[in-house]
């Protein structure tokens, strides 16, 4: 820690406190001080292993992890620092982003996700707060792999409930076999939010979250989602909803954009488009 000075607390994330600091050369970094659940046991070896994988991820759309400092009691991750995140931008952009901006951010998000999925790393906690942006319009994904290294928490460090808004229905219904499709669901939710300017499924509990999803996309059954009835939290008494036409809840997205989003937000994870496939979609071939 001696290398870094001028510590300024800039946030409390899901896993601990984030500081802005400078090194002796005047370069700015984001220091993420990880709170360990059981401090007496030290850092779990699984976390160390995951973090070492993160150091190997090198992509222009992923926040770079420069250094890992660990003592017996704490773990500090040294990341590149960016000034703003997508949530803050959406908060001030009433009615959503311009279509060219939304498309650029989505393309960058998918590029970073595709790279990580190719390297067998899941994010598991994608949301606008984890997407950092700079003045040049570059988007970088933060907190990659931390959900796996430290477990997806139920509450934030500040005792806020972790948002469920971007969580896939298979996870909400207790699936333990999750893979890359859970990230693609989150990407779809973020895409819709960039276009609409507000969250698509702002649930207040796991049950409410599922019902909000079903009210828009329809209630799943064995025909459109094989084996859904075997999920631990599937309820045969779920209210039955028919899917709504996409145009009714998406403003300002053309047909190719709707087609791409519909492939991201498939209820059945096995039917969801992959990041690599999404990058090849016609939506990115057309000019605005």
Curated annotation (Swiss-Prot):
Catalytic residues identified in the record: 125 (proton acceptor)
Keyword flag Electron transport: no
SMART domains: S_TKc
Binding residue positions for ATP: 10-18, 32
Residues carrying Phosphothreonine: 14, 158
Names of the cofactor(s): Mg(2+)
Modified residues (Phosphotyrosine): 15
Entry's Gene Ontology cellular component terms: cytoplasm; nucleus
Regulation: Phosphorylation at Thr-14 or Tyr-15 inactivates the enzyme, while phosphorylation at Thr-158 activates it.
Catalysed reaction equations from the record: L-seryl-[protein] + ATP = O-phospho-L-seryl-[protein] + ADP + H(+); L-threonyl-[protein] + ATP = O-phospho-L-threonyl-[protein] + ADP + H(+); [DNA-directed RNA polymerase] + ATP = phospho-[DNA-directed RNA polymerase] + ADP + H(+)
Domain Protein kinase: 4-284
Molecular functions (GO terms): ATP binding; cyclin-dependent protein serine/threonine kinase activity; metal ion binding; protein serine kinase activity; RNA polymerase II CTD heptapeptide repeat kinase activity
Top-level taxon of origin: Eukaryota
Similarity remark: Belongs to the protein kinase superfamily. CMGC Ser/Thr protein kinase family. CDC2/CDKX subfamily.
Function: Serine/threonine-protein kinase. Involved in the control of the cell cycle. Required for entry into S-phase and mitosis. Probable component of the kinase complex that phosphorylates the repetitive C-terminus of RNA polymerase II.
This protein's name: Cyclin-dependent kinase 2 homolog
Organism of provenance: Plasmodium vivax
Lineage, broadest ranks: Eukaryota, Sar, Alveolata, Apicomplexa, Aconoidasida
């Amino acid at each position: 820690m001696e290398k870094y000075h001028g510590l300024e607390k800039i946030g409390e994330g899901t896993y601990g406190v984030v500081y802005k600091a400078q090194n002796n050369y005047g370069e700015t970094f984001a220091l993420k001080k990880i709170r360990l659940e059981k401090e007496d046991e030290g850092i779990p070896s699984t976390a160390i292993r995951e973090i070492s994988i993160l150091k190997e991820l090198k992509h222009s759309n992923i926040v770079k992890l420069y250094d890992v400092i660990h003592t017996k009691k704490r773990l500090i991750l040294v990341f590149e620092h960016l000034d703003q995140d997508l949530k803050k931008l959406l908060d001030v952009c009433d009615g959503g982003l311009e279509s060219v901006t939304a498309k650029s951010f989505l393309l960058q998000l998918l590029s970073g996700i595709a790279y990580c999925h190719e390297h067998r790393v899941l994010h598991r906690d994608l949301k606008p707060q984890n997407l950092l942006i700079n003045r040049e319009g570059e988007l970088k994904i933060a907190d990659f792999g931390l959900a796996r290294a430290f477990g997806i928490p139920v509450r934030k460090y500040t005792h806020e409930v972790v948002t469920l808004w971007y969580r896939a229905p298979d996870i909400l219904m207790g699936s333990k076999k999750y893979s890359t499709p859970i990230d693609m669901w989150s990407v779809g939710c973020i895409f819709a939010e960039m276009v609409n300017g507000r969250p698509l499924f702002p649930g207040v509990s796991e049950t409410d979250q599922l019902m909000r999803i079903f009210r828009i996309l329809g209630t799943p059954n064995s025909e459109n989602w094989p084996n859904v009835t075997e999920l631990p939290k599937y309820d045969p008494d779920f209210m039955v909803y028919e899917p709504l036409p996409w145009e009714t809840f998406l403003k300002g997205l053309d047909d190719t954009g709707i087609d791409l989003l519909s492939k991201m937000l498939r209820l059945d994870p096995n039917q969801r488009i992959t990041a690599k496939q999404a990058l090849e979609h016609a939506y990115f071939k057309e000019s605005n």
